[in-house]
């Protein structure tokens, strides 16, 4: 087939440009070439360095790989682990190609300084406050948390002995938001329905906004994202949240002038005590509220839902757990602080649920700031995102659900090894709380909060699935959206108030 003749207009355009090029000084031409090289050469080098890593789903187009990631990254990580055993490989996400490293790389990655591997930490003040104020005072405030949990359960759970259907996700969010409000912001605002709605809505709206942005083309996001209705709702909720924070700051700034005023023990006051008053304290405290909502309310809600969804289909664990709980209570029915460590069967059940139904599939994520060479000689170029997949996703070690597996291992272990079987542990194989220097600072609060809520529910309620279905296969399946895995929303469970250990239905 003969080539088609060039359009005369195109020939004329080329001639004019060649003529202009002849008249352009050589220095300008060279400057232009250098500029183009400075723009495109780094991109070429980056792609060349990335191409050295094998690509999962290489036979598909980029768009098809994005679609596969969207419907379930969890399965891709498992396939990649089996195909590239112990090797690094590339995976196409919704945003970019990232490098997935084997678990064995974790030891050397932890030695890399922050200027090489970046963990974005814009909330260092909040983290510092949690470590210095919240965690050391947990023993002191645990009894207060228990009181708030009791009040919240009386409000949101049935008070009679008949089977009652509840919306698990809504109820879990109501309870955790209500209890946490007293610690996060305190005062009258903690009981303000408007503030509680803000904290609950922010959690929901963030998920909606994230999903809406993720399905938008990367290059269009700067233009379209601010116009998305989901993003607008999220920003409106944050503005309302800011107004509540402002109200509390102004009230406390006025009270501090009173020498008889005793500052409350809550996160808002601790942040104010550590704040630099020359800077924008309002914005800092609003950002802190956002972090606490995401880090505590959302994460704790997902964990509680996962545990209740599982308990409803494994009713054989209810009585042993209830017996352990009632045997640990004080004579007046209150929960002692020491129970947080004594709930061995509960601790084991929590850990087993997390192993079978993990909500975090990329527990280790870093952005490479400076080129980094692994011990096997593989070079990680600057700018690339690196992840390590949760071994619970890629490993089929725990195919059978055994709620007391870790309790039995703990009982059979030597004293020094017993902590390794606790739910609170964070190490190279268990990432539920993060890892190394970036382990979740609020894990001790979340740990205590969830155990107190669960203890009260199991102590006082029977739980089951609609239709009386049982068995782990009957459990509500988790929902996947790319690398986000979560419990399904708005699913019903049945609860029934039972006789308390004093022998009557309250």
Swiss-Prot record:
Membrane-spanning ranges: 26-46
The UniProt record gives the binding positions of heme as 440
Following inactivation of the gene, the phenotype reported is:
Impairs the production of tentoxin.
Query: One GO cellular component from the entry?
Result: membrane
Co-factor requirement: heme
Q: Which EC class is the enzyme in? A: oxidoreductase
The lineage's top-level taxon is: Eukaryota
Q: List the membrane topology term(s).
A: Single-pass membrane protein
This protein's pathway reads: Phytotoxin biosynthesis
Q: Name one GO biological process term.
A: secondary metabolic process
What are the record keywords, sorted?
Glycoprotein, Heme, Iron, Membrane, Metal-binding, Monooxygenase, Oxidoreductase, Transmembrane, Transmembrane helix
Pfam families to which the protein is assigned, alphabetical: p450
Q: What is this protein called?
A: Cytochrome P450 monooxygenase TES1
UniProt source species: Alternaria alternata
